[in-house]
Amino acid sequence: DFAVMLQSLNDLGYAVEWRVINAADYGMPQRRRRVFFLGYKKDSKVYKQLKKSTPVDWLLKDGVIQNTFKAEQDSEVSEFVLDNDLVDISNNFNVGGKKSLFENTGMMIDGEVTTLKTFPVYKGKPTPLKSILEKGKVDEEFFIPKSELPQWKYLKGAKSEERVSADGYVYKYAEGSMVFPDDVDQPSRTIITSEGGKSPSRFRHAIQTKDGLRRLTPLELERLNMFPDNHTEFEGVTNSKRGFLMGNALVVGVVEKIGETLYRFNQ
């Protein structure tokens, strides 16, 4: 878990800062929330800068992530120490706790953890899904046949129904509805590994275009992760596989911007 990861890096001589970043909060085309870890070896230039700052100042003013993606404090600061071996932490850390001790923003240095909630600060414009859609003719394979529309609607819709498990157990299944078709005036939902498949799905995107209702193309999925066009187009790589690859990827715009800041910090 999170504590084991931090302690492992601490044992290897790293200080760590982290932030949960939703790419769409900073003007990117996909709502994809991921934890970004930055580790600084004790002999590195950034580590020495970190040591001169306080943990709270690093997280809210001086740090690499804060100088890439601005955020403001949204909770009290929590501090604690990781000082046990990995086995003990794995077996006993926060046992019985009802919530994680780690917030969406934090750092660890010499086993001392500082963590707090933050919220994103961004004054630019969002990037809507419609801005990355292909302009030309899209292959017929991506359009949803009318015969499959009822199944798409069922899967995307709200449900409260009895189901029977493989061993005969009857249980109540319920879930809320999803927007269908997807709203192209907002950043996309998180794309997943099954995005490239053809069958009706609750989680695949479906957009209404002037030519009909269709799924997203591999090119559009690449753009949602901010890869170059046709980055995954190779002989023998199917469209389904290309969708799978993008479902496993990060929004590289986040990584690129953090990398640019790291470069500046190391000059």
Task: List each language-model region with its residue ranges.
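Class I S-adenosyl-L-methionine
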Residues: 1-180
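C-terminal target-recognition/interaction regions appended to catalytic cores
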Residues: 107-267
